Amino acid sequence: MGEERAVSLDRRYVRSADYLARDIQGQTVLIPLSGGIGVRDEPAYSLNPTGAAVWRALDGGASLGEVAGALAAAYGGERAAIERDVLALVTQLVAHGMVHGADA
């Protein structure tokens, strides 16, 4: 289900239309869709607030490096650490088919 190309800070990524994001009791939950809400055999995926900010930014308009830079500016964190966290999260999301490269 994963992409052949490695996840990179230079690439732009987009959310899959096969997942619906909903805020439930303070958490963002990604719900798999297929023929209706929650029909796929895959579990829902919960994101913390930072992960939710990454998810919202994955619209193909900014590279992952730009997303990480915006998060570092917004949260005052160390850019290198945020880049590692963004890469780790997006690698998981790509592996589960929740996002894909904007050029795919």
Predicted ranges, named:
Residues 2-9, 36, 40-104:
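Long, charge-rich, low-complexity alpha-helical segments
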Residues 26-32:
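A short glycine-rich, His/Asp/Glu-containing loop-to-beta-strand
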Residues 1-26:
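Hydrophobic packing positions characteristic
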